[in-house]
Amino acid sequence: MLNDPLVQEVLFNIFEGDEKGFEVIDVLLEKGETTEEEIAKELGVKLNVVRKLLYKLYDARLVDYKRWKDEDTNWYSYTWLPTLEKLPYVVKKKINELIKDLEKKLEFEKNNMFFFCPNCNVRFTFEEAMDYGFSCPGCGNMLQEFDNSELIKDLEEQIKFLKEELKNNPFLK
């Protein structure tokens, strides 16, 4: 399940690029119910790093926790447990959100004309270019028309790929 490239991509997105998140999941799967302190000790990372990753997993509903009060210290402690049975739902939801975002970008690209500055490598909509008199506000160079047909093609391919993954990926069935 965690070896599926689509699942890995969604988890990577949930962890906001922090690959330690995969190690946290591995420890949770190995130990089942465990404390954040035990995870931090096993991975050799700071407790706040583990907590941040656990909170991200919790926000995605991929872990749950139990809270209890230590009678000696009066501090609350947490034990965490994986709830990865929800992973297919989470992956579908994230992929559908991504498809919607890509479709919005595609619509924007199709419905606008663009110009760019070859010096500064900055792109402008037609309206922005017109406001600047078709000269770059950064360097003063004349703006050139930007052909976004390749970008449109790439967006269409990404959308098609993700829709096919949703339909055909055995993990998401």
Curated annotation (Swiss-Prot):
The keyword Transcription applies. One of its GO terms (biological process) is regulation of DNA-templated transcription. Residues 3-88 form the HTH TFE/IIEalpha-type domain. The winged helix domain is involved in binding to DNA in the preinitiation complex. Belongs to the TFE family. Monomer. Interaction with RNA polymerase subunits RpoF and RpoE is necessary for Tfe stimulatory transcription activity. Able to interact with RNA polymerase in the absence of Tbp or DNA promoter. Interacts both with the preinitiation and elongation complexes. Transcription factor that plays a role in the activation of archaeal genes transcribed by RNA polymerase. Facilitates transcription initiation by enhancing TATA-box recognition by TATA-box-binding protein (Tbp), and transcription factor B (Tfb) and RNA polymerase recruitment. Not absolutely required for transcription in vitro, but particularly important in cases where Tbp or Tfb function is not optimal. It dynamically alters the nucleic acid-binding properties of RNA polymerases by stabilizing the initiation complex and destabilizing elongation complexes. This is Transcription factor E. It comes from Methanocaldococcus jannaschii (strain ATCC 43067 / DSM 2661 / JAL-1 / JCM 10045 / NBRC 100440). The gene is tfe.
